[in-house]
Amino acid sequence: MNIKKKLIYSIISSKDTKEKESEEIVVKLSKQSNKKIYILHRALIHQLSNHRNRNAHTQTRGEVSGGGRKPWKQKGTGRARAGSNRSPLWRGGGVIFGPRHKKYVNKINKKEKQLALRILINNKFKNTIVTENFISKISTPNTKILVNNLKKYNLDTNNNILIIVNEKSNDLYLSTRNLKNVELLAANHLNIVSLLKANHIIINKDALDIINKMYND
């Protein structure tokens, strides 16, 4: 059974960092706490599994080209018998029990994934700052301006910071690229790992509207 919970965010002015207004969003959450953990675990495994890619791939004796002819006759040469020069015992032969390419696919329902994201949005509520327009002063790629903007909200780049905007701009991407603890995401591309990892979240007001529409179906 799902319950509805109201989250009231204070909209902080980008000029003087004072509260300008407030905005309310309603998130649907699971009533059972053990179900929340289960859903989060499923969503996390889904994302991590689908990012795995085992490329190492060795060939068995049946896959190595050549070796169709018997190297020498079975008897009379004094040598050990051999049926193919692509045997794993031979140089250039196949590999026994070597690594094989494998796809790690873990499926999850859309509603389960959305519920997991809503649970995390609720859990990170106290560590979330909503700004009127965070990127107003960044018209060219400039990491220093970005760091100074974060400091205005008492955010330290030594902590993991997630910036959520309504639309990713190239200037903002280039400004955050050099900061290892700062991640930039568009509101329509939220993911479990980024939300779990973030110590602080800063959201554009327009991005909050997108989150409210997208993840509450």
UniProtKB/Swiss-Prot annotation:
Annotated spans, Disordered:
51-85
> What keywords does the record list, in alphabetical order?
Chloroplast, Plastid, Ribonucleoprotein, Ribosomal protein, RNA-binding, rRNA-binding
UniProt lists the gene as rpl4
Chief localisation class: plastid
Q: Which domain of life is it from?
A: Eukaryota
Q: Which molecular-function annotations from GO does this UniProt entry contain? A: rRNA binding; structural constituent of ribosome
Q: Where in the cell is it found?
A: Plastid, Chloroplast
Fetch the InterPro entries from UniProt.
Answer: Ribosomal_uL4, Ribosomal_uL4-like, Ribosomal_uL4_dom_sf
So what does this one do? Probably binds the 23S rRNA.
Q: Hey, which family's this protein in?
A: Belongs to the universal ribosomal protein uL4 family.
Report what the protein is called: Large ribosomal subunit protein uL4c
Question: What are the GO BP annotations of this UniProt entry?
Answer: translation
Supply one GO CC term from the record: chloroplast
This protein's assembly is summarised as: Part of the 50S ribosomal subunit.
Which organism is the protein's source? Gracilaria tenuistipitata var. liui (Red alga)
